[in-house]
Design a protein with these regions (language model features):
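Helix-loop boundary and gating motifs at the non-cytosolic
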Residues: 1-30, 63, 187-224, 230-235, ...
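Cytoplasmic helix-loop-helix junction between adjacent transmembrane helices
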Residues: 76-118
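A membrane-interface helix-boundary motif in multi-pass transporters
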Residues: 130-145, 221-229, 341-365
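Transmembrane alpha-helices of Major Facilitator/SLC transporters
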Residues: 30, 230-253
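C-terminal ends and interior cores of transmembrane alpha-helices
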Residues: 53-67, 267-280
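Juxtamembrane intracellular "pre-TM" segments in multi-pass secondary transporters
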Residues: 157-193
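Helix-loop junctions on the cytosolic side of multi-pass membrane transporters
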Residues: 136-139, 143-170, 371-377
């Protein structure tokens, strides 16, 4: 959704916008892990049905909403929708291949999934940005329509046979203990730490490129009606670029190694954030076009490394725990950044620059720690 920051900023102060984002991530805390257990216990199909329905409700509320309270409710439904999808989509993919005895194809197929997902996301961003030139809320109407289409598609999905045999996982407390115990595996623990760090770093350019782009194009003046199209095209271009890299992510990982690949992605994203924080320049806008490349290159190799190490009856729960840790880390980080945000409705360069430089410092520290943690393992 390339217009959410602009849409909220029309009606709320920057600090309120950041708090709305924090509310979303904190709501994830309530449903992320239970949604993973629900998927392991009741099946992938039902979980995805709930996810699609919740997203539809969220976008409808966004479309009709006009104040902080209504947007907060919509954020809660959005959290439910994305949490119930998180981990279950990957688990459904692996379980489906396992049912066919084709698990070895998972990594390469995940790369194709990532590529296609980003191509679709890029197209949606351009269309949403164009529609939002006339009215920002129309982008949410289109999103509601697509959520409804997704719901119809999920109704046609069958539960994988391999997962039907494991639909009775341990009791919730025991399941949680088993999943956390999996972190004794050195590779799973390292990937878990990487995921928490990169979740924070990947979201920083995504959250702040809209006001940054507006300042570059308009030298800090108020957001004009052309900005949604500009941000939509920019977001779409970023997704199209990322889709190119996603297509060969599995092969790149095989060539240079998983840890080396993932560490290089942390370094790249940190440098991007640092550049954004140092200056307002159109060349940085071009650099930020590559901000989604780390997610494109990490998704398939990371999932391919995790899936065989975690059993089907724990896989969605484990992935949900990992996702929760990353989202919770970003929620706390975002709440902290809101303390140095402007209280006015218009984003200003000085506090924005400070937020970005703080984020870059966090990335440098995390990269150093992750490099040390990964040595010899």
């Amino acid at each position: 959704m390339p217009v959410f920051f602009l849409y909220f900023s029309q009606r709320l102060s920057l600090s309120q916008v950041l708090r709305l984002e924090a509310i979303y991530y904190l709501c994830i805390v309530l449903v992320e892990v239970p949604s993973g257990y629900f998927s392991d216990r009741y099946g992938r199909r039902l979980t995805l049905l709930i996810a699609s329905a919740a997203l539809f409700v969220a976008y409808v509320i966004f479309f009709f909403g006009d104040n902080f309270g209504e947007f907060a409710v919509a954020q809660a439904f959005l959290a439910v929708g994305l949490a119930f999808n998180s981990g279950t989509d990957t688990s459904l993919h692996y379980d489906s291949l396992a049912s066919l005895g084709r698990e070895s194809e998972f990594g390469d197929r995940e790369a194709i999934v990532a590529r296609n997902s980003m191509l679709a996301g890029g197209l949606a961003a351009v269309i949403g940005g164009a529609v939002a030139v006339f009215e920002l809320r129309y982008a949410y109407l289109l999103s509601a329509g697509m959520a409804l289409v997704t719901l119809m598609v999920v109704l046609k999905i069958a539960e994988p046979e391999s997962h039907k045999k494991t639909l009775l996982p341990e009791k919730p407390a025991t399941q949680l203990k088993i999943c956390l115990g999996l972190l004794r595996h050195p590779l799973l623990a390292w990937i878990f730490a990487f995921y928490v760090l990169i979740t924070v770093l990947n979201h920083i350019p995504y959250e702040f490129y809209q006001p940054y782009l507006a300042m570059v194009l308009q030298k800090g003046t108020s957001l004009a009606s052309g900005t949604p199209l500009s941000t939509g095209i920019h977001f779409g271009a970023a997704m199209f670029i990322a889709s190119f890299f996603a297509a060969f992510s599995s092969r790149l990982c095989q060539r240079i190694g998983l840890k080396r690949l993932l560490l290089s992605l942390v370094a790249f994203q940190t440098l991007t954030i640092l550049a954004m924080g140092l200056t307002l320049n159109f060349l940085i806008v071009v650099l930020v076009l590559f901000r989604t490349v780390p997610r494109a290159l990490m998704t398939a190799p990371m999932n391919a490394a995790i899936a065989p190490l975690v059993g089907s009856s724990q896989r969605a729960t484990f992935l949900s725990i990992q996702s929760l840790a990353g989202r919770l880390a970003f929620a706390g980080f975002l709440a902290g950044l809101s303390l140095v945000a402007s209280e006015s409705g218009q984003a200003q360069w000085s506090p924005l620059s400070t937020q970005l430089l703080i984020s870059a410092g966090f990335g440098i520290t995390g990269l150093f720690a992750l490099s040390l943690f990964g040595k010899g393992k």
